[in-house]
Amino acid sequence: MAQGISMLAIPWYFTAVIHRETLFGQAYFLITALSLFWGLYAGTLVDRYSRKKIFLVINIAGLFMLASVSISGFVNGSLPWYLVALVFGNTMFIYNIHFPNLYAFAQEITPRESYSRVTSLLEVQGQLTFAIAGGLAAILLKGVNSHFHFAGIDFNLPFSIRPWKIYEIFAVDASTYLIAFAIIYRISSLPVQAKNMNTSGLKERVKTGFSFLRRHRLIFIFGNASLAVFLTIITFGTYVQPVYVDAFLHRGGGTYAIGDMSFSIGALMAGFLTTRVFGEKSAIKGIIALSLIAAGMYLFMALNSLMLLFFFANFLIGACNAAIRIQRITYLFHHIPNHVIGRANSIFFVINVLFRVCLIGVLTLPLFHNGTNIIFALAILAAICSIGALVLLPQYKKLKLQPAVV
């Protein structure tokens, strides 16, 4: 929850509150570059230590950072931009170990025949909390007037809510980390398979992940190409979308946050329907088709400035991304052993981050911030989704017949 609120609120804060989107792009570029090193190390931690303890530690880290910065804001009445950027970096670093750890933990305690159901439930849970975070971000960023106009309809409410300061939002975020810590602390689980603790040095543990993927080339190709849509989602949600809403749609923070909510609702529906529609045997075909649909939606947004169409495109992209994630993780669960999955996922992550660094470096160029030129960034995102699908297409039959290794 805290990750979702921060990841939504901070980009909009830089874009529409202090009007320093170029500075945010540079900070985002630096944070992403630093996460290259963290990503590899995080994977070795996931495979070496108790995954429950890792969850507890990262929630304490998030609580400490958010509470400290929030207190500074309350004391001084404002926050310098670099402290806001620091919170964003901290949130990204937590995000980058949270999901590899979550999936490794899920595989560890789940019977093979339940992989698809569990990955769907994880996606539903994740997107539900993100949808709630989107709603909170919309309310906290923009506030709520007692009278407002939306989609051609006038609404009258018996109350109003003022827009919150960024440090007040951070205080809410800090409390969610504390709640998460309390819930996770009480979780008890029984692993389906004994965890093979690797106590070798860092270099040796990293090499093990590379060695596995070198021996399983198809898994390496699949693991990276199937992340193409995710690559665009992260870049679009944290950097391109705030500029697009502000410069192309000429709308405010409410539209930005509702767009994210639309994305989450689409993802939530995909969480319930993906396994029923595609099944485990059609995962590769589904990922290819959904990647192309996502590409089409980016082009759709580049060619239209209607707000409702923007929400619809976000809805479909969210559904495509969630369905791809479910099918991708289920496939990897069947083909990567639990004792190495943290490191394998960290390698996929680092490669994805490398592409993201290059992409952000391009999108921070002044060209994309002149007038409505941000639509060219959407065209680039569409091309990336299409390339991911085209890489998987020639490998379709081989991937479908790839034997399970666990």
Language-model features, listed with the residues they occupy:
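Juxtamembrane intracellular "pre-TM" segments in multi-pass secondary transporters
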Residues: 189-224
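C-terminal transmembrane helical hairpin of 12-TM major facilitator-type secondary transporters
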Residues: 284-324
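Helix-loop boundary and gating motifs at the non-cytosolic
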Residues: 1-36, 215-263
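Substrate-agnostic recognition of the 12-TM MFS/MFS-like secondary transporter fold
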Residues: 1-7, 28-46, 50-62, 83-144, ...
